[in-house]
């Protein structure tokens, strides 16, 4: 079997760490592993495959010098903008950032939906979709193929690790401060003691309806990503309206979905379609308190769906609640599936 030299740009970040775990736990045919990062992190040690690796600086030359075959980019859009094209001259690039997602020459891939697009990459770059988009499309696509979707309204409840290690540290530090203050004075106004860290407001004991920047139409970039990326991945144009909220959860994004179909539907058929959908786990027995939660979804590679029910007033509308580990399903696992599909079918 052919083996590959693999690089991860942003190896020390939250998604980079999940990529390493995924490579360690999969049957990925690795010949050489090269961790890459910024000048700030270069020279530091990182553990992978039961040994220590020195992080190299990301440069335009490093990919050719190290004979990289596959390069995963998870270090932010500006890094992908600067270095991905250089890497793609000698390596297949799988980019986890938003920079290339809507580029017409770069396929945007969820392998369970449009794996064939992996081989339609003239720039030798394949984009990994937004984490919230990946889990949503894995629910929408099988339903659309069976019932035909008319429109979607989605509200997200997104974990702090979606903002990387700085988001995790903000929640931990703010919770520590808040709990210490509440121990001294249970009636204290936390607005007076908590300071914003990685987010626009303190995230501890809070919910912030603000992910990415606001656009002139009142939507955030995150909300518009879910619209435009879904259209590109699924090849559809039905309306999608999103509201994205950051919540004080460490890991796994949740989404409340309201899906309007073109015709009335049978709820039993919905269950059958989703039970047979790849990477989807139906978790739905409210009488026994069985429904998706972020804790249950964390450290898994499934999109959990539950609370499935017909709208009380519109027989064509389905409601549901889906949860997935955004660091795995929404980033690392999807990227690895792209690379593995490429290797097996090239």
UniProtKB/Swiss-Prot annotation:
HAMAP family linked: ASADH
Active site residues of this protein: 131, 253
GO function terms (MF aspect): aspartate-semialdehyde dehydrogenase activity; NAD binding; NADP binding; protein dimerization activity
Binding site for NADP(+): 12-15, 40-41, 161-162, 326
Official protein name in the record: Aspartate-semialdehyde dehydrogenase
Binding annotation for substrate: 158, 246
PANTHER family: ASPARTATE-SEMIALDEHYDE DEHYDROGENASE (PTHR46278:SF2), DEHYDROGENASE, PUTATIVE-RELATED (PTHR46278)
SUPFAM superfamilies listed in its UniProt record: Glyceraldehyde-3-phosphate dehydrogenase-like, C-terminal domain (SSF55347), NAD(P)-binding Rossmann-fold domains (SSF51735)
Coiled-coil intervals, chain numbering: none
Sequence similarity: Belongs to the aspartate-semialdehyde dehydrogenase family.
Pathway the protein contributes to: Amino-acid biosynthesis; L-lysine biosynthesis via DAP pathway; (S)-tetrahydrodipicolinate from L-aspartate: step 2/4; Amino-acid biosynthesis; L-methionine biosynthesis via de novo pathway; L-homoserine from L-aspartate: step 2/3; Amino-acid biosynthesis; L-threonine biosynthesis; L-threonine from L-aspartate: step 2/5
Enzyme class: oxidoreductase
Subunit structure: Homodimer.
Catalytic activity, EC: 1.2.1.11
Catalysed reactions, as listed in the record: L-aspartate 4-semialdehyde + phosphate + NADP(+) = 4-phospho-L-aspartate + NADPH + H(+)
């Amino acid at each position: 079997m052919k083996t590959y030299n693999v690089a991860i740009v942003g190896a020390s970040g939250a998604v980079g760490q999940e990529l390493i775990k995924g490579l360690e736990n999969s049957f990925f045919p690795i010949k050489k592993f090269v961790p890459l990062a910024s000048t700030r992190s270069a020279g530091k040690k990182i553990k992978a495959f039961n040994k220590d690796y020195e992080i190299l600086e990301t440069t335009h030359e490093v990919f050719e010098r190290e004979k990289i075959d596959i390069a995963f980019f998870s270090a932010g859009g500006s890094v992908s903008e600067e270095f991905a094209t250089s890497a793609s001259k000698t390596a297949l690039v799988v980019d986890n950032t938003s920079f290339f997602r809507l580029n017409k020459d770069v396929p945007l891939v969820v392998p369970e939906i449009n794996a064939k697009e992996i081989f339609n990459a003239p720039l030798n770059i394949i984009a990994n979709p937004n984490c919230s988009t990946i889990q949503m499309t894995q629910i929408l696509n099988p339903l659309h193929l069976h019932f035909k979707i008319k429109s979607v309204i989605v509200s997200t409840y997104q974990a702090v690790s979606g903002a990387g290690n700085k988001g995790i540290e903000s929640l931990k530090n703010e919770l520590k401060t808040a709990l210490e203050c509440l121990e001294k004075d249970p009636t204290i106004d936390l607005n007076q003691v908590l300071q914003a860290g990685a987010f626009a407001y303190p995230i501890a004991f809070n919910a912030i309806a603000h992910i990415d920047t606001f656009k002139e139409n009142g939507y955030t970039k995150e909300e518009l990503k879910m619209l435009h990326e879904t259209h590109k991945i699924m090849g559809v144009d039905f309306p999608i309206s999103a509201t994205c909220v950051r919540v004080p959860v460490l890991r796994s994004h949740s989404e409340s979905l309201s899906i309007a179909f073109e015709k009335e539907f049978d709820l039993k058929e919905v269950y059958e379609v989703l039970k047979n959908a790849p990477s989807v786990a139906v978790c739905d027995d409210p009488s026994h308190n069985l429904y998706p939660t972020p804790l249950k979804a964390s450290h898994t590679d499934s999109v959990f769906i539950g609370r499935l029910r017909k709208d009380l007033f519109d027989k064509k509308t389905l409601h549901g609640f889906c949860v997935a580990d955004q660091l795995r399903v929404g980033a690392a696992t999807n990227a690895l599936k792209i690379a593995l599909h490429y290797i097996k079918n090239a």
